[in-house]
């Protein structure tokens, strides 16, 4: 039940097929003290929550349906089954039931596999009465564990194995897991759970490992970003919920896990949780264009972390030989394209490129002097018009990848200048943004576009610049709501990108 991290550099990608969804069906929160304002704010980005109880917490018990967020009742142990049945009789909007809470822990539900199996038919009867699906007992590795028949159930999968043996005809539609391990350890944990061939709910997770303690909230952010991106994009993960909304100590106290701050407000960690891109399996990157590597279609073995590169949001890393990531692409026309991969690493590596599972070439990656010391690696790629599947396969490990840019060879002659740009004030308080170009020639015609974190354009203005400093009024047409935005300023063969916060 815990994890790890880096510093965040928040520039959001613009690419073909940007996800039109505003919130993930998978994403939820494990928390039992929501206020109306808490739920109103969180409901923009979460689709469900639970509180370890049979019914919603009292402040939102009769109104939560107004927020389009599912409540999922839990039978914490066998005693909780009656309460779940009573609530299911009252609330016709529920879809799922959660089984027992960490029954292999003596300090939690404290039920042996046989005891859990004996109690299960009562929960199953409720599900069948109301046409609901059931999540298995939620398990994890324990310290003080239940024992039965000479077996101490430290291993959660041994517990589930014996539960299923004792309950072989029971209705169990999903596997329930908790996890607090550090780093990318959740990947191997999920891989172990795939053997049951059922969709998975991860109903508690955070980096909270006393053997590998997160030192600060920035490290927790790094863990959250990589883990949520993995869970969001894994097809075997049905739903997940971060632990927890609030703690008594607050976000600046170990283990630094609070999503909520003051009433109705998000912490920085909470905002990051809400902002992780929603997975769209139909998304295609348009070529020519840029592929942000964390937005893969399918992946094996790789893990993401926040990048400190000059642009990008997350990079993929934790590379081992045989790891791979796939991307759906749409190529506008036949041609030989320039390929630029943004690489960082402490050793030389190699990447195989495959198109539609046909090997095309191998790219060698250099030692850049560090995992966040970024450099461009250039090559060429022949592509035909239409839909394709581009696969990156790690031949030799030792590198991170931020993005891959695939551009026309003809356009390479007119190199795009990245303008060194200063934007202030930031945060923006009254809609007025001052832009300063730090370059020899600042004049020309430029198009200013503002995008929200989902890639939706919310502002457009053409400006004729005749000096290094100019102003943009973001509220010129409509008032821009508070939030995080991506400002793009493009001219002939030049561009500038800045992340801004509007208050």
Task: Describe these PLM feature segments.
Residues 280-409, 426:
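Extracytoplasmic
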Residues 51, 73, 101, 156-210, ...:
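Aromatic- and acid-rich polysaccharide-binding/catalytic face
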Residues 25-97:
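N-terminal carbohydrate-binding/catalytic regions of secreted carbohydrate-active enzymes
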Residues 68-72, 234-291:
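Aromatic-rich peripheral "rim/lid" segments of glycoside hydrolase catalytic domains that contact
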Residues 91-113, 134-145, 170-179, 202, ...:
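Active-site groove signature of glycoside hydrolases
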Residues 135-148, 196-224, 243-261:
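Active-site clefts of carbohydrate-active enzymes
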Residues 4-14:
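Sec-dependent N-terminal signal peptides
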Residues 416-424, 428-503:
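C-terminal outer-membrane/trafficking sorting elements
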